[in-house]
Regions:
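Histidine-acidic metal/acid-base catalytic patches
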Residues: 246-255, 259-273, 292, 327, ...
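Catalytic-core regions built around general acid/base machinery
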Residues: 39-48, 293-304, 345-353, 438-443
């Protein structure tokens, strides 16, 4: 293949005079090219003309073509140490200048956006979408929660050494390759063979508009779904954590649902993006019956992993209230969930030591729950943990009956996110008679600031990953 063949191929692909093109390339992909690296660059410039611009990335070792462009006498290089671009041609300076003033390396004010706004193109010469840096611009425009920051000490355009930070900076793995068919099917990308190279020419503005639309619908649009990819698992967790942070409620998970051993629980909670755990069972043993040292070790392990214990749930009334209070204080647990019953004296013992006591309904009717709560009325705090499964097992509709009869909006501190059928069969969320969807919906209407606990007070018919998916679907359909 000769230089003239490359010129012809680029024109047939859609490039024309005065265009701006950002090229990502592999010189070797052209195969038996009868010419030099400079001949490839000259072929592009003969198509673009003196008023066009050929832009290449130079923020790392990205191949011989970018290096040769960077070495040209008439080159203009953007002034930043991250996302750096070099360009030649009449429009290169206009596109690349001002990169230093942009708050992000790839977003607003960056050359990547300027190329798109000017109607420019992205050319992938013998490389795939994995090299398409402008896709990071879509992430930056969306301000996706898994993006980080990049800080560098470098010389400013005035020659002074400064330290500055670029926000919404991309991190590790993406599944940009998986976006290729979407571009092709949408008609914003032309694909052709030039020599041995598969060449893609993409309309930059249309690509960004499409990617932002995809990202608005699904913030994980650029991530892979491989459970063995730790990078994308972590980034998906950041998306979920950000979503929950924008809710009024706080989300916790029962330790029984999180796993068997504490290290396993930590790994799964972090993978899900959940920062709170409610202690009920660890290694198959009820936390109620653990000694203070065991509890403290568990709490400390979670704390080291930046996971906070939201409460300890006891399924029985402690016989030795003072001893139970003592080990909770030693372990650093400041909230306990107890079965609802006449327990004013014991509850007072917790309150005196600064431990919050919340009561949960277990096999009681709504009216019985109200009466039991009245018996602890002398306490400053009279808070209720609403268990849909508990009311189902008591033969009452949790929302249509119990919620209204008990007027629990006045006392609720936590909603246990669980579900069952009338005959006691455990179900995934909103698949039983627990009316969990209605309960979550009404709490959101009130901007409820208390706890929602996945698997609280009842087993879940699956693992934590499945529970989070079910809960996400629940939120999506409200």
């Amino acid at each position: 293949m000769k230089k003239s063949d490359l010129v012809k191929g680029l024109k047939e692909l859609g490039l024309k005079k005065n265009d701006i093109v950002l090229m990502h390339s592999s010189f070797r992909s052209l195969g038996d090219f009868k010419g030099s690296v400079d001949d490839v660059i000259d072929a592009f410039m003969s198509v673009l003309g003196p008023k066009g611009a050929l832009i290449v990335p130079v923020f790392g070792s990205l191949g011989i073509l970018p290096e040769r462009v960077k070495a040209r006498k008439d080159v203009f290089i953007s002034e930043v140490p991250v996302g750096t671009l070099a360009g030649i041609g009449g429009r290169a300076k206009d596109v690349l200048s001002g990169h230093w003033e942009a708050e992000t390396a790839h977003g607003e004010g960056s050359p990547f956006l300027k190329i798109a706004e000017a109607g420019g193109y992205i050319c992938l010469l013998g490389v795939d979408q994995d090299r398409n840096t402008t896709l990071h611009s879509a992430e930056a425009l969306l301000k996706l929660p898994y993006l980080g920051s990049c800080t560098r000490t470098c010389k400013a355009p005035d020659g002074k050494e400064v330290t500055r930070t670029w926000h919404y900076y991309p991190g590790p793995h993406r599944d940009f390759i998986g976006l290729d068919h979407i571009m092709r099917e949408s008609g914003i990308m032309e694909v052709s063979r030039i020599g041995d190279a598969q060449v893609r020419l993409i309309k930059a503005k249309e690509m960004l508009e499409l990617m932002v639309e995809l990202g608005d619908e699904d913030p994980a649009f650029a991530l892979c779904d491989n459970p063995a990819c730790a990078d994308c698992v972590r980034q998906r967790a950041a998306i979920f954590a950000d979503r929950i942070a924008n809710e009024s409620f706080k989300l916790s998970v029962s330790s029984r649902l999180a796993g068997h051993y504490v290290p396993e629980m930590i790994e799964k909670l972090q993978a899900a993006g959940i920062k709170y755990v409610e202690l009920d069972y660890v290694q198959g043993k009820a936390c109620t019956f653990m000694d203070a040292q065991q509890l403290k070790r568990i709490v400390d392990d979670f704390k080291e992993a930046k996971i906070t214990v939201s409460a300890l749930r006891s399924y029985v009334v402690p016989e030795d209230t003072n001893g139970f209070v003592g080990k909770m204080k030693e372990a650093g647990i400041d909230r306990v969930i107890l079965p609802l019953f006449d327990f004013f004296y014991g509850a007072s013992a917790f309150a005196k030591e600064g431990i919050v006591v919340d009561f949960v309904n277990t096999h009681v009717t709504p009216s019985q729950a109200v009466q039991a709560l009245l018996k602890v009325a002398p306490l400053k705090r009279r808070a209720f943990v609403f268990s849909p499964s508990g009311f189902v097992l008591a033969g009452k509709n949790p929302f249509l009956n119990a919620w209204r009869v008990g007027q629990f909006i006045k006392t609720i501190a936590q909603l246990d996110v669980n579900d069952r059928t009338w005959d006691g069969e455990i179900r995934s969320f909103a698949k039983g008679n627990g009316e969990i969807k209605e309960l979550v919906s009404i709490l959101r209407c009130h901007n409820f600031s208390g706890w929602l606990t996945l698997g609280g007070g009842s087993p879940y018919p699956g693992n934590l990953e499945a529970a989070v998916k079910d809960f996400t679907h629940l939120l999506d359909t409200i």
